Amino acid sequence: MLSRTSVINKSRLTRTISVLALAFSLAACGGQEAQNNTSTGDATPGAATDTTASGPAKLDLGGKVSLTGAGASFPAPLYSRWFFDLNKKYPNLQINYQSVGSGAGVEQFTQGTVDFGASDVAMKDEEIQKVPADKGVLMLPMTAGSIVLAYNLPDVPELKLPRAVYTDILLGKIKSWNDPKIAAANPGAKLPNEPITVIYRSDGSGTTGVFTKHLSAISPEWKSKVGEGKTVNWPVGVGAKGNEGVTAQITQTPGSIGYVEYGYAKQNNLKYASLENKAGKFVVPTEESASKTLEAVTLPENLRAFITDPEGDESYPIVTYTWLLTAKKYSDPAKAKAIEAMIEYGLTEGQKNAAELGYVPLPANVAQKVAAAADAISPDYKIAIGSSNNTSAGAPQQGGNNQ
């Protein structure tokens, strides 16, 4: 792992990632205001207004409230930023989020050891059935992003990978960077005669779940030999824990390629491939191409959708929402109120941090659906996100796959 701590400041993440920073604890945030100049108290267009039960400048929780959460590493940099800034706005609310992977996050939420979980894959029916009936679960998409194939080839600034090529690399069938199939898609590229080292997630991972669901959708061979899931038996490669660990391993390993959330690659200056989409077009992962993908997907009423192989010439092929997991009912009224305030912040002021950190702001219609679902958690708080959130409402065309 990289040794220096990754710090979220006003405009960016520093260029080095560590597990410590991404498991960012806000228990000590009250004394760190001088280190972060981001203001979250001023009213801004699209942000929460005085229609909340407590008002935007004051959150009456009857004292200090601490929330604990655990789960996906995919949104961890963004959540860390949100929770840091939210603590500055409401010093009586402290949130500790541990980046442990989607699998562990779902498990800890189900067992009741945390107040909320996070997962890059919406919970399946069999997982929902394990949640205590008196608690229930809401799955709330809070942001979205691309999963990229980042690589370490110093002399190859750009790389195109056809669908059949990147699946064959991950299956171990293409073993060298100068393989004719890679060369054919990249004429003139200085592809080295070096072995390819695949880096994959060693922990239970929603990022892996999304990625392998896509691979299974486009490759019958992958589907039959490997399949999909938060953990799979990888045919080749080296495992690393978390998006943080995969990012570090790629950085340290010449000739490597691995899948990480776009923001991690962007903030750490990793190169990433253009991938061939369903329409046969090579698309570079950006906030814009991810937004194009989301515009082609209708999120159903239960807020669960799997985007496995999206339509559209401009769509990047591997994009996912990432979900916050909360109870429908909390026995502690103060925690219920705090959970709603946390969600409201994420849907309003927090969305403005999304593109900055490599994520995709929620379409306005999705933010409205999330607010409506979450507003039932506490009778003492009213989530207000305005008639138009500072997001880009898409024109939904294609339904997501429900489960």
What kind of region is each of these model predictions?
Residues 2-17:
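Bacterial N-terminal signal peptides that target proteins for export
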